[in-house]
Amino acid sequence: MRTNCWWRLSGYVMRHRRDLLLGFGAALAGTVIAVLVPLVTKRVIDDAIAADHRPLAPWAVVLVAAAGATYLLTYVRRYYGGRIAHLVQHDLRMDAFQALLRWDGRQQDRWSSGQLIVRTTNDLQLVQALLFDVPNVLRHVLTLLLGVAVMTWLSVPLALLAVLLVPVIGLIAHRSRRLLAAATHCAQEHKAAVTGVVDAAVCGIRVVKAFGQEERETVKLVMASRALYAAQLRVARLNAHFGPLLQTLPALGQMAVFALGGWMAAQGSITVGTFVAFWACLTLLARPACDLAGMLTIAQQARAGAVRVLELIDSRPTLVDGTKPLSLEARLSLEFQRVSFGYVADRPVLREISLSVRAGETLAVVGAPGSGKSTLASLATRCYDVTQGAVRIGGQDVRELTLDSLRSAIGLVPEDAVLFSGTIGANIAYGRPDATPEQIATAARAAHIEEFVNTLPDGYQTAVGARGLTLSGGQRQRIALARALLHQPRLLIMDDPTSAVDAVIECGIQEVLREAIADRTAVIFTRRRSMLTLADRVAVLDSGRLLDVGTPDEVWERCPRYRELLSPAPDLADDLVVAERSPVCRPVAGLGTKAAQHTNVHNPGPHDHPPGPDPLRRLLREFRGPLALSLLLVAVQTCAGLLPPLLIRHGIDVGIRRHVLSALWWAALAGTATVVIRWVVQWGSAMVAGYTGEQVLFRLRSVVFAHAQRLGLDAFEDDGDAQIVTAVTADVEAIVAFLRTGLVVAVISVVTLVGILVALLAIRARLVLLIFTTMPVLALATWQFRRASNWTYRRARHRLGTVTATLREYAAGLRIAQAFRAEYRGLQSYFAHSDDYRRLGVRGQRLLALYYPFVALLCSLATTLVLLDGAREVRAGVISVGALVTYLLYIELLYTPIGELAQMFDDYQRAAVAAGRIRSLLSTRTPSSPAARPVGTLRGEVVFDAVHYSYRTREVPALAGINLRIPAGQTVVFVGSTGSGKSTLIKLVARFYDPTHGTVRVDGCDLREFDVDGYRNRLGIVTQEQYVFAGTVRDAIAYGRPDATDAQVERAAREVGAHPMITALDNGYLHQVTAGGRNLSAGQLQLLALARARLVDPDILLLDEATVALDPATEAVVQRATLTLAARRTTLIVAHGLAIAEHADRIVVLEHGTVVEDGAHTELLAAGGHYSRLWAAHTRLCSPEITQLQCIDA
């Protein structure tokens, strides 16, 4: 890979031959003109000034014409060179995204989101930085070749001396290439690890906040950042070692040429004009030589980035697309023939499964969490290929079928209802983008989502936000069901399609499903007894093995495991009584229950960043000392660089014109000493800048991440999560890059400008006025450039965040995109965002290409003016030839820093936009404050006082005037239709959000007065969105209490019924879990979440649909454990299944954000209202007479 990455990149560049030819052609023509200009200068000095026998006007016209041509050619070179860089970056990004869309299940399990983000952002930026200079490479090489040819024509001895250092420079460059490539690759790997930590913390932010683990996640980031810090310091040291050395060697060659050329001019071997022309050529070549040396460093970093990007592009699915189309039969059969499968070799998840579903038949597959149901569904849709055996659809092996024809026949309702950014209508029509509004409404009506949609101001055009998390779990699930029904599949695969809806809605959905599956084959993977009414036959899975298949009655009679799964488990009651007497978390003197209370490591806390109106500026003030030292060294380095022109003037006027060779030798020796001193100072400056930059980056990233962790959940809605990831990664790096390089360039440029102006005034003040005539034009051009580019950079930065958000979204929802054959539409969406970012980049490049060459044009015009007037003064004896030559050299140096300042403005704009975003983030108010009340043990009284709440993305309020008082120790179950506000109440108690109006009080205190971390340390929460962080199963359970012993972890798992599932996993409690739990089923994740909440022994327990993914037997165990826990603490439960409501102290019924009923179970049944209807539906759905279940007319 590494040997051919340059060839691969050149292939991408060659896709844009027109731009390449224009850029190279302009570079070639511009180089020829630049190399010939010193010859014009030689003629002017020898013939028009020194000899005084030729007019200056014709030469001035030639110089002005050359300046105009150079401006146009430089514009073309810069514009098309930058355009190539943006086009190739876009092509690489699109190819990487296309590779992502092709991934099968194994590739999706292999790649982390952190790797994806870094390789498509940071690594691509490294490649783009090199591609910007593609035309410059040719220009520099041509400049060197033509320059050497011109110098050889001027003087062979001097030319030989000038090229003596080329082999030395080549050897040093070769060594730097080898070391920098390895160091940069290592640093990029660590950067991917940091991004992975950030992305995981943002994706799992609800879990982080639920258990008050913000500091723990910050510790993770700090540890990953420390490893990155060490790797980046190695890169900085190598850059400091090789960069100044490669730039110093050409300068030493200049001093050697100065000494030899001056001696030859003094001896009459060459003319003063030839000497000045040779020096001008050498000066012209010094810049390309230094640039090429610097580009070697950039090239090694770009190579490391290119290798990583190309690895992503080259990733291929492990399964091979078939060649045969699926048969066009109206009904399809599904058959598993002795199927075995394992995610890891030699660790089977399914063992010898033989199961057939006849065409037109509905089969229900039941089993406990981790039994293999979801894996079976993945094999049917061919996310994976079987290890042994075969899966056949319509009698054809799925491995022989084209994926397009296979997936076009299948409709999938997954256990996790993944939605995409866009509107409700677009998500329903995800599998049929050509669907009419009437067809979308019909599917929504079938999924019982239409009533909710009609209450929204924008109806089906309402945006759902990233991953649809602004909707309730039931609403997302019904949209996913409508999406599958609109697809009109011949084979319908549903994985618990009604687990998050209430009983009344489930009855209606079942009636519709009964009609929908009447003329098609269907497989229902379910844990709910009510769904079995739709099935013709039932299959029972247990630990990856098929136990029984038959009609529901037959299996009920002969399969004990089936009866156990669908019935409560009374034999566990005694264990629960023991558990009640032996709590998992025994109080220990001086020991808290959260990780934050046990760590001795100081990390950035909620108030570590300095307060005030501009926290970013205050934070950067911590590094004033190192930054000042770095800038002081830069100033010394710059001053040393201003001495050579003065030494050259002395050497010409005294050493050459007056034949005082000792003056020439002293000038050359002083120049050499100056170059060496400059090299040492430059090395020190690079070391200090490198160390300081990495320290600032480490500190800034940690503080921004710690602050982001403490923001309210509303900051993570819409695309806020992607913007936060961008802020912690790309934005902090943009700021530090400017501090490390841009600020250095600014200091160099300012010091150079001041020093040159002083020198020019000292040589001849009158000529300075000629230079100042160009300044008003330059100031006007700079103002216009800044005004136009500022808007472009801001838009481009925001668009980059959108590109990253789209990548994260499709990486998370790839299986749904593939199941509904939406890869091409995903590619179109990503292309639109990426192309918009590219066009903004090209627009910015056009502005740069117009502005920077204009500065050089003004420099050339000023040089011509000074040359004309200076020649007249030389003839008049006012100034010497040496003084005029020095003046011309200084003019070249004068406009160089002006151009670099203008170029630095590009980095400044990027940093300014990034700083604005980070400043805005750091200024966002967090729920906690330094004056917050500390929280000890809570009694648990909860009061809602006239509480209203509205989500930012919705006009309809989620809660409207809630007044409730929940005494300490009471168990309250909230019921109602999906979207009625139940989960929002739980989130307000957890203080994920603050009420829009009204107050939530606990133990008589407004939650806004509590220390938010201390308060959440007293809670145990199970949210709808299950998330676990990468690590072992044991780590996942102990997330809220990392100090728990293995025995305590196991006891918590036993009490919620998770222990059998865990021991069935490979390595049991040490089983490795991927970020987000992608290698676990929804039921397994829910059991881990319950054990996690149980372990912390909370004062207030909050359960939001905590058992929707569990089978009845496991659910019964969990409910008994919940009631045992609830006996000692306040417990608030959101439930669609009403089994636990019967045993609760109190039931609160919500509809449309208001309380419509409140009372005990028997009271509400007697009232005959909302709860009575819900209970009647629930009773019918959960009747033990499974074969005779009937849904009531809701």
UniProtKB/Swiss-Prot annotation:
InterPro entries according to UniProt: AAA+_ATPase (IPR003593), ABC1_TM_dom (IPR011527), ABC1_TM_sf (IPR036640), ABC_transporter-like_ATP-bd (IPR003439), ABC_transporter-like_CS (IPR017871), P-loop_NTPase (IPR027417), Type_1_exporter (IPR039421)
Any single GO CC term annotated in Swiss-Prot or TrEMBL for this entry: plasma membrane
Binding-site positions, ATP: 367-374, 976-983
PROSITE patterns per record: ABC_TM1F, ABC_TRANSPORTER_1, ABC_TRANSPORTER_2
Listed transmembrane segments: 20-40, 56-76, 130-150, 153-173, 258-278, 279-299, 628-648, 660-680, 743-763, 765-785, 847-867, 878-898
SUPFAM superfamilies named in the record: ABC transporter transmembrane region, P-loop containing nucleoside triphosphate hydrolases
Domain description: The ATP-binding domains (NBD) and the transmembrane domains (TMD) are fused.
Biological role: Overexpression increases resistance to chloramphenicol, ampicillin, streptomycin, tetracyclin and vancomycin.
Family to which this protein belongs: Belongs to the ABC transporter superfamily. Lipid exporter (TC 3.A.1.106) family.
Protein name: Multidrug efflux ATP-binding/permease protein BCG_0231
Native source species: Mycobacterium bovis (strain BCG / Pasteur 1173P2)
